């Protein structure tokens, strides 16, 4: 668990949780954490840059394991305005076919 500050918004920060079990990942990802400006940002799978692109309000993921929401030209994961995540997307992010990766989870808070 660690904290990362938003490079685009000094009043925002992220709490990153690594190494979650599939069950914990799914529970957190289906929780309604609040409005589009506060709460869950996305589920990270595998090795990620953890770079937060605030212009899209997406969690940006490097690699090509798949895309959940967002534009198809980049590896975005779930965007904040459409939360909580649907169970199908959560299962995809937290479980198969990514079970060989270590799931991570990010929660964004805005002061």
Model-based region annotation:
Residues 1-110:
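Intrinsically disordered, low-complexity regions enriched in Pro/Ser/Thr/Gly and acidic residues
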């Amino acid at each position: 668990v660690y904290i990362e500050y938003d490079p685009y918004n000094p009043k925002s920060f992220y709490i990153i949780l690594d190494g979650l079990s599939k069950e914990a990942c799914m529970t957190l990802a289906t929780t309604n954490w609040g409005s589009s400006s506060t709460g869950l940002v996305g589920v990270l799978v595998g090795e990620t840059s953890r770079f937060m692109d605030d212009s899209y309000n997406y969690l940006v993921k490097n690699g090509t394991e798949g895309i959940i929401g967002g534009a198809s030209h980049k590896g975005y994961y779930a965007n904040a305005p459409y939360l909580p995540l649907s169970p199908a997307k959560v299962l995809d992010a937290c479980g198969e076919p990514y079970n060989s990766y270590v799931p991570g989870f990010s929660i964004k808070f805005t002061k």
